[in-house]
Amino acid sequence: MRTPNILLASQSPRRRELLALLAIPFTAVRVDTPEQFECAASLEENVRRIAEEKAREARRLYPEESSSSIILSADTVVEHDGLILQKPQGEEEALAMLQSLQGRTHSVHTGYALLYGERKHTAMATTRVTFNAMPKREIMRYIATGSPFDKAGAYGIQDPVMASYVSGIEGCYYNVVGLPLSAVWAAIQKMVV
């Protein structure tokens, strides 16, 4: 069976690049939904809920496009020492996040949601990443690029400066970039059967 068009509810250029790797037709649309964590819910419940809220908002905002498409959305966070690191709000927060990750292992969690007609699938993928120690001058140089400010945990593993300090990865690399491709592709295949 032919895979329907994907309606990607994301402003992330990285998610668009990743989805393009699957060589399936997709359209990216903008949705603005709050990415607020509920204290009473688990991390997994939160990222799955946020992803589903984005997908439902895309369905509401783009009814014509979504009527025959699979809607895909995601939410990525970094977890380190029991803290949730989302997108930093400024240089100081980016510096604190990046310094806390140096020489240590953290987890990257991506909740994703797929809506297709009445069908729904939500899940979460987790990848563990270990960084070598990074000198403060390198961290400041990276922050000066502006790259940390639209990324959970204040870094992009694919960014050349950061990639040179990754000493280990356990799980899906693409999950750290923003979308666990193999898990998403498997879920899409199940939806269209």
Swiss-Prot record:
Active site residues of this protein: D75 (proton acceptor)
Catalytically driven reaction(s): dTTP + H2O = dTMP + diphosphate + H(+); UTP + H2O = UMP + diphosphate + H(+)
Keyword set, alphabetical order: Cytoplasm, Hydrolase, Nucleotide metabolism
Compartments where found: Cytoplasm
Gene Ontology BP annotations: nucleotide metabolic process
Entry annotated with the keyword Repressor: no
Gene3D superfamilies cross-referenced by the UniProt entry: 3.90.950.10
Cofactor needs: a divalent metal cation
EC number: 3.6.1.9
Gene Ontology cellular component annotations, sorted alphabetically: cytoplasm
Gene Ontology terms for molecular function: dTTP diphosphatase activity; UTP diphosphatase activity
Keyword Protease: no
Broad class of where this protein is predominantly found: cytoplasm
Cross-referenced HAMAP family: Maf
Function noted in UniProt: Nucleoside triphosphate pyrophosphatase that hydrolyzes dTTP and UTP. May have a dual role in cell division arrest and in preventing the incorporation of modified nucleotides into cellular nucleic acids.
Name of the protein this chain belongs to: dTTP/UTP pyrophosphatase
Lineage, opening ranks: Bacteria, Pseudomonadati, Chlorobiota, Chlorobiia, Chlorobiales
